A protein has these predicted regions:
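Catalytic cores of the polymerase beta-like nucleotidyltransferase superfamily
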Residues: 1-397
């Protein structure tokens, strides 16, 4: 069933109870653009407590902002009361929210015209700020005064640039100039929120457009760990980065171009998780090695996914589209490995202890590592008889 059809009974129920209800925001925008639709957002004239009285399964996720989560057929739907927002404090949050009865008033508080479009259950469009025109013109334009929108929530500056990259759009002149004159406000925003927008921008359809705007508006000089590397960040524009598939590849490339002495600290400044940081630094370190020759041991140690990322990045660094890299030869080499991890080895440390009648110690780890290496390099068959014979010879040395 189409996603709007599944949500339609919720709006019908609100309307049946005497309230207005509309689809709003990103879901309407993406429908008009024929893009994949994520979450469905619903706006209504019903107050939060009225919404909760109408539906049997609700979660009061943000009552102070008028938001209630309604569970319908095991699907969660966010329903928010029409509202206006007063003066913002700390360039992030409104100091006061006022519930209103007009959808037009509600749409007025939103960031960009393309996100200020509402739709009825009959697919009728309510568009007081001509968002559909801007949408079809490929234009990111603020609702009302751009400067005011960014002073309300400074993250909107990055959201605008992120949308340029994701949709391959362009910024309206007033929106661009307002970002340029309010760029320093981004320093009031939590790095976790900034990171989400930057990463969506970097893996968008047109990441170069996004990077170019970060530089042109000078926003880049107010982002952690990037202001020292503006020139190197600019170098990314010369490379076919749009051909990279994962955010880990892109972060490794950024670190490589910046020639960072302390990549862990750079990523830590972006509040990266330890596991993710470890993966990115691994790829970064591979890039700093001499041109890789894929022996059995090297491919076994690196693993196929990271080996492919490395080769794709080598293409991009050499100004070649990453999609030119043919993964099949690397996959074939990997598939011929006798084992893929330690757990594939046919014996354990307990076997060695039993065969040798020795006590455990540092020697055990060393011998297991040597057996692993011998098997990977096809110098030793991965079966108990062969390994036992090799081990007895080792004991006699």
């Amino acid at each position: 069933m189409e996603i709007f059809e599944k949500a339609k009974p919720i709006l019908d129920r609100l309307i049946k109870n005497g309230f207005e209800a509309y689809f709003v925001g990103g879901c309407v925008r993406d429908k008009l653009l024929n893009r994949t639709i994520g979450d469905i957002d619903i706006a209504t004239s019903a107050l939060p407590e009225e919404v909760m009285s109408i539906f049997p399964k609700t979660v009061p996720t943000g009552l102070q902002h008028g938001t209630v989560l309604v569970i319908q057929n095991s699907e969660p739907y966010e329903i928010t009361t029409f509202r206006t927002e007063s003066t913002y404090y700390d360039f992030r949050r409104p100091s006061e929210v006022t519930f209103v009865k007009s959808i037009e008033e509600d749409l007025k508080r939103r960031d960009f015209t393309m996100n200020s479009i509402a739709m009825t259950t009959k697919n009728e469009i309510i568009d007081p700020f001509n968002g559909t025109i801007d949408l079809y013109d490929g234009l990111i334009k603020c609702v009302g005064e751009a400067k005011e929108r960014f002073q309300e929530d400074a993250l909107r500056m990055l959201r605008g640039i992120r949308f340029v990259s994701q949709l391959d759009f362009r910024l309206h002149d007033e929106t661009f100039n307002a970002i340029k004159s309010n760029k320093q406000l981004i320093e009031n925003i939590a790095i976790e929120r900034i990171s989400v927008e930057i990463e969506k921008m970097l893996i968008g359809k047109s990441p170069k457009k996004g990077i170019e705007l970060l530089i042109q508006t000078n926003l880049v000089n107010h982002l952690p760990s990037l202001k020292e590397y503006t020139n190197q960040f600019n170098d990314l524009l010369e490379l076919p980065i749009q051909s990279l598939k994962t955010i880990e590849e892109i972060w490794a490339l950024i670190l490589y171009k910046c020639n960072s002495d302390n990549p862990e600290q750079v990523l830590r400044n972006w509040k990266m998780s330890n596991s993710r940081m470890k993966q990115i630094v691994k790829i970064y370190n591979l890039l700093n090695e001499t041109k890789m020759k894929w022996s059995n041991t090297k491919l076994y140690q690196v693993g196929l996914p990271d080996a492919i990322k490395y080769e794709r990045l080598q293409c991009v660094i050499n100004h070649i589209d990453a999609n030119e890299f043919n993964e099949n030869s690397l996959k074939n080499l990997y598939n011929q490995l006798p084992i893929y991890s330690k757990s594939d080895i046919c014996i354990t440390g307990n076997d060695l202890l039993e065969w040798s009648q020795l006590k455990g110690g540092p020697w055990l780890k060393e011998v297991l590592s040597e057996i692993e290496l011998q098997i990977v390099e096809n110098q030793l068959e991965n079966n108990q008889l062969a390994v036992k014979e090799w081990f007895i010879n080792w004991l006699q040395k």
